[in-house]
């Protein structure tokens, strides 16, 4: 009886060993799918949600109308907006801050914006070296939007048929 149990344990162990080797051998000669980041980069979708930016109209006026929908819809409460009324009766933002540590990059702010003012770009490689620099101000977001406007416009055009 003991010999029978020892035989079963040895047989069971070898079968499992050969099954594991078969899986290893199966993938040993296939094309590798691992990307060696940062030397190699994968293509990004036009819908990729990375660093935020604020956009302007072609005449240079900022698009944000201070409706505060993005602030209301943000599940992480990462957006802070303060606004005031201008002489012509329209509202504009005086403060538009995004806390990048709180942001979960869900894209709700982008979807809620009626004038396409706040967008998320393809840029995902950024870092903060000092305390407090993780809060992006209105000026920083506008400058970032100005810098990447051509890519943002191309991504919006490519994604337009799905909106």
UniProtKB/Swiss-Prot annotation:
It comes from Hydrogenovibrio crunogenus (strain DSM 25203 / XCL-2). Its EC number is 7.1.1.-. PROSITE patterns: 4FE4S_FER_1, 4FE4S_FER_2. It is a peripheral membrane protein. It comes from the Bacteria. NCBIfam families: NuoI, PRK05888.1-4, PRK05888.1-5. GO terms for biological process: aerobic respiration. It is found in: Cell inner membrane. Residues 55-84, 94-123 form the 4Fe-4S ferredoxin-type domain. [4Fe-4S] cluster 2 binds at residues 74, 103, 106, 109. Belongs to the complex I 23 kDa subunit family. [4Fe-4S] cluster 1 binds at residues 64, 67, 70, 113. The keyword Glycosyltransferase does not apply. GO terms for cellular component: plasma membrane. NDH-1 shuttles electrons from NADH, via FMN and iron-sulfur (Fe-S) centers, to quinones in the respiratory chain. The immediate electron acceptor for the enzyme in this species is believed to be ubiquinone. Couples the redox reaction to proton translocation (for every two electrons transferred, four hydrogen ions are translocated across the cytoplasmic membrane), and thus conserves the redox energy in a proton gradient. GO terms for molecular function: 4 iron, 4 sulfur cluster binding; iron ion binding; NADH:ubiquinone reductase (non-electrogenic) activity; quinone binding. Keywords: 4Fe-4S, Cell inner membrane, Cell membrane, Iron, Iron-sulfur, Membrane, Metal-binding, NAD, Quinone, Repeat, Translocase, Ubiquinone. NDH-1 is composed of 14 different subunits. Subunits NuoA, H, J, K, L, M, N constitute the membrane sector of the complex. The gene is nuoI. Its cofactor is [4Fe-4S] cluster. It catalyses: a quinone + NADH + 5 H(+)(in) = a quinol + NAD(+) + 4 H(+)(out). Binds 2 [4Fe-4S] clusters per subunit. The lineage of its organism: Bacteria, Pseudomonadati, Pseudomonadota, Gammaproteobacteria, Thiotrichales. This is NADH-quinone oxidoreductase subunit I.
